[in-house]
Amino acid sequence: MNGDGEQPGPGDGAARDELPSMDLVRRTLAEARAAARARGQDPGRGFAAGPAPRRVAGRRRSWSGPGPDTRDPQPLGKLTRDLAKKRGWSGHVAEGTVLGQWSQVVGAQIADHATPTALNEGVLSVTAESTAWATQLRIMQSQLLAKIAAAVGNGVVTSLKITGPASPSWRKGPRHIAGRGPRDTYG
């Protein structure tokens, strides 16, 4: 307010908090619209434009009927598969399925006698409980790959590395260098 008791106008250099509340809102909105126009954007008119015009021709609004619809609730498994596919996690989820659901993928009998240990770059390492089972799994290798491909898709597991039970050995680790030959080990 100035000294005469008049209300300040938008052209006056008065502070914003001296304006009545609706004038302040209108002035702020006008400034925002002007800034949008300066950036080359369409500021729109908000609700002042009225409701959207009614469409006379064209497709009518479809209400959900008694049959299945895309708006119906979806199973959680389908939603997680879609999310994994959208985010690019499908390969990792498939690898986890092979390792986590081994008995459903290959069958209960094989799962009782063989355990997957690692899956690196498409090579699945499987440890059998006996050398006989390791030999049997090597014979069935193509059938196992077909079962795995049917469960999780092609290309997830490209080959199998089947090993028997670990026998006692002096070697440590998967790679080794030849030693100096036989020595007197036991005193």
UniProtKB/Swiss-Prot annotation:
Annotated region described as Disordered, given as residue ranges: 1-77, 166-187
Residue stretches of biased makeup (Low complexity): 31-55
Biased composition (Gly residues): 1-12
Compositionally biased spans, kind Basic and acidic residues: 14-30
InterPro entries assigned: DciA-like, UPF0232_actinobac
Family stated for the protein in its record: Belongs to the UPF0232 family.
Protein name: UPF0232 protein MUL_0004
